[in-house]
């Protein structure tokens, strides 16, 4: 097979493979070994009843006992050694040629990854009809199937296993039963007994300061890149366990976040893309890390942290936009870009008009304020000039009046001044006028109580007269 076939071709929603060398895929196991693994995997226990296709186990078998009896897998995928081109790459090339000719490609013709390759037990190698490589971000735009072509369920199973839910994009895996590395913060660390009493030195033991000095100074952490883990006071233990988990899971794709719960023997691994999480779940199920533990890999439930929920919603929105853009044709993309350019131009024009209007209003406002300030300055200058003129004219008007009053006082030569004498004269004239008026008018009528009776006449007196 040529190098062009090895590199693969593009198809609707799929990207050509470039992460592996142009070589045929290696057969991971022989056909006999594969048959033995399949027979052991589907073996029916003696006390088992009907096989439940939902929970993928037999009825009548205790769940805890069944989980404890799960042994470590005999095979494991090695991406650097096992990946290569298969018949699926030829299928991708054929689909790309059909698309260039204008023929549509049905969704059921999509090419998926090999699940046996992910588990490390594919006996076909280059003759396999599935891809022997890691999935790409936009390889599988359909949310109804996983990267292996299996249909998703409407909701998660009770034990969070299986293919996942088609109503949610889950990129986080729960990894349980991991072996925690020993460190300062580990419960089984030798130095833990030295500071369980609050840092006080025990009899014949060491203090917390001795432990810190022995381990050396703490390395400086970058606040932008370092993320403190849950239930952790020092980064040494987190880094020790985190390095092990990251080394084993980073082989299956780019890791976005990793959180190790110290003292609980579990971790949460969040991949950047959901397809990588699906591949890692099948590749690491019932595997071991650096020790003989058998880890339990399941889908993680929703994070109750509001910040995490907001971040997941934003990532889902961006992923939806990328999926829509991947399914659009070049003409539709160009039309959308032109429409956005026109909208941006109209928005810029609107902003220019608004800025011009604001600039004109600011200029008129500044002009009015300058005119008011000039008028105020002129008014204050005129007021100051008028006040100075009034102050200068006041002494000249007061001097003649004082001289005239002094001359009048000298002429009279009496104890009373001229003003008092004029008032007395006016009072005398008023008294004389009132006396003359009393001579012309008749005398007033008496106002006693008998006056009305004296003027009363009876009818008998009129008759006598």
From Swiss-Prot:
Residues 1-28, 181-241, 346-371, 391-465 are annotated as: Disordered. The keyword Repeat does not apply. InterPro entries: Cwc2/Slt11, Cwc2_RRM, Nucleotide-bd_a/b_plait_sf, RBD_domain_sf, RRM_dom, Torus, Znf_CCCH. It holds the Pfam family RRM_1. Residues 1-21, 408-437 have a biased composition (Polar residues). Belongs to the RRM CWC2 family. A zinc finger (C3H1-type) spans 113-135. One of its GO terms (biological process) is positive regulation of RNA splicing. GO terms for molecular function: pre-mRNA binding; U6 snRNA binding; zinc ion binding. Keywords: Cell cycle, Metal-binding, mRNA processing, mRNA splicing, Nucleus, RNA-binding, Spliceosome, Zinc, Zinc-finger. Involved in the first step of pre-mRNA splicing. Required for cell growth and cell cycle control. Plays a role in the levels of the U1, U4, U5 and U6 snRNAs and the maintenance of the U4/U6 snRNA complex. May provide the link between the 'nineteen complex' NTC spliceosome protein complex and the spliceosome through the U6 snRNA. Associates predominantly with U6 snRNAs in assembled active spliceosomes. Binds directly to the internal stem-loop (ISL) domain of the U6 snRNA and to the pre-mRNA intron near the 5' splice site during the activation and catalytic phases of the spliceosome cycle. Associated with the spliceosome. The C-terminal RRM domain and the zinc finger motif are necessary for RNA-binding. The keyword Chaperone does not apply. One of its GO terms (cellular component) is U2-type catalytic step 2 spliceosome. Residues 391-407 have a biased composition (Low complexity). Its main location: nucleus. This is Pre-mRNA-splicing factor CWC2. Residues 227-302 form the RRM domain. It comes from Mycosarcoma maydis. The lineage of its organism: Eukaryota, Fungi, Dikarya, Basidiomycota, Ustilaginomycotina. It is found in: Nucleus.
